[in-house]
A protein has these predicted regions:
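Short hydrophobic beta-strand element within catalytic cores of glycosyltransferases
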Residues: 297-300
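Donor nucleotide-sugar binding/catalytic pocket of nucleotide-sugar-dependent glycosyltransferases
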Residues: 39, 56-58, 138-187
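Nucleotide-activated donor-binding/catalytic signature segment of Leloir-type glycosyltransferases, i.e.
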Residues: 244-264
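Conserved acidic donor-binding segment of nucleotide-sugar-dependent glycosyltransferases
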Residues: 312, 316-324, 332-337
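Short acidic/histidine- and often glycine-rich active-site loop of Leloir-type glycosyltransferases
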Residues: 124, 172, 289, 303-318
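Short alpha-helical donor nucleotide-sugar binding micro-motif in glycosyltransferases
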Residues: 82, 259-260, 267-272, 363
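Aromatic "clamp/platform" in nucleotide-sugar-dependent glycosyltransferases that forms part
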Residues: 280
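Conserved donor-binding/catalytic core segment of Leloir-type glycosyltransferases
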Residues: 197-214, 220-224
Length: 376
């Protein structure tokens, strides 16, 4: 099967959508399918002409997020491309101008297309004090996904939410986690020593974008409460983003490791003892699965990946937006090394079945079953 994947974010950009889409592309290729990626050009990385089969279009920087871009409309170019080499199916991963162009092109050429719902833009609007536009955002997303035959989502919770908001043909496609990469075996005493920690001291970690919408003030308050009980604790931040400079200047005792990839990222996860994920606005939250696969107990709110996979045997799942309970759970787990130790194995076991090959096989089956004219 020849598949075109359209996305406005892709590695080397680091975010949940980029890494998820790249994983799906790898899985399709491993299954013998041909994959064409259509995405914005990434200045400083992409060469002229493209060094692989990717089809690159013009993009623009996203305000306040250096390093991230959205693709400009490119319907005519995409139609020309697909007329010369028609894909059997199209997957549109992002809802920007490029994704919209791709759905229009697929409709015009009667190529079956499905879409992915990866980001809760409606929640972002509320967070930035623009709650009044939430109905407009949802209306746009409903129209966008209404042009695809199916909309793929990572959790049953999100599927129910979208159906309740009038989205049609929503289908579950669970997320995978690479348990060969993310593993307790990556734990590194050398790395912990670089953090100023031996095995008997506590490393609290956060992995993800360092941005206002991630609710990071709660993570800071939770750590300060931990620190009041355990003077030996250190807080390690893995990632980057617009809030990093301010966070770093106000908290000089925190350790900022910057962006990490591959085995280095896996070592950072596995070398931690407790993972804090305070975000309230994730569509899923891949980092929770990666922490669990690495054998690190997590504290996260009860939605997305945490609702699907986290339990009290391997961390703490907290009632949505209950900040006091989040802090209390973080302190409880930080204080009790003996209780945390068995959680490492149980957290790993809880996600062991989320093998990328199974998820990608399901994805290929969805794409192969798409029929033009079957969208509502």
């Amino acid at each position: 099967m020849r598949v075109a994947i359209v996305t406005e974010t892709y590695p080397p950009e680091i975010n949940g959508v980029a890494l998820t889409v790249a994983g799906l592309a790898r899985g399709l290729k491993a299954g013998g399918h041909t994959v064409q990626i259509i995405r914005p050009r990434q200045p400083g990385f992409d060469k002229e002409p493209a060094q692989n089969d990717d089809f690159l279009v013009r993009g623009m920087r996203i305000p306040r997020y250096p390093g991230l871009r959205f693709g400009l409309p490119a319907r005519r170019k995409i139609e020309t491309l697909w007329k010369s080499g028609r894909p059997d199916a199209v997957y549109v991963a992002t809802e920007g101008p490029l994704g919209s162009s791709a759905l229009q092109a697929a409709q015009a050429l009667r190529i079956p297309a499905c879409s992915g719902f990866h980001t809760r833009f409606d929640e972002f609007a509320r967070y930035y004090g623009l709650g009044w536009i939430t109905p407009l955002v949802l209306a746009y997303l409903r129209r966008f996904h209404g042009r695809s035959i199916k909309t793929l989502v990572p959790t049953s919770e999100l599927a129910d939410f979208l159906r309740d908001k009038g989205f049609d043909n929503v289908e579950l496609l669970r997320r995978a986690v690479d348990t060969r990469l993310f593993s307790p075996e990556r734990r590194s005493l050398k790395l912990r020593r670089e953090w100023g920690l031996g095995e008997d001291r506590l490393a609290v970690i956060y992995v993800g974008r360092i941005a206002a919408e991630k609710n990071l003030d709660l993570a800071v308050r939770a750590f300060r409460a931990i620190q009041a009980q355990r003077k030996d604790a250190r807080f390690v931040w893995v990632g980057d983003g617009p809030a990093r400079a301010g966070l770093q200047s106000h908290n000089p005792d925190f350790i900022f490791s910057g962006m990490q990839r591959g085995e280095a990222l896996a070592a950072h996860y596995a070398s931690g003892d407790l993972f804090l994920f305070p975000s309230l606005h994730e569509t899923f939250g891949n980092v929770t699965l990666e922490a669990m696969a690495s054998g690190v107990p997590a504290v996260a709110f009860d939605y997305g990946a945490a609702r699907e996979h986290l339990c009290d045997a391997c961390g703490r799942r907290i009632a949505y937006n209950d900040e006091a309970a989040f802090i209390a759970a973080a302190v409880e787990l930080a204080r009790d090394d003996a209780a945390r130790h068995p959680m490492r194995t149980l957290a790993r076991n809880a996600v062991a079945a989320l093998d990328p090959s199974h998820v990608c096989a399901n994805f290929a089956a969805v794409l192969g079953g798409l029929k033009v004219g079957s969208a509502a």
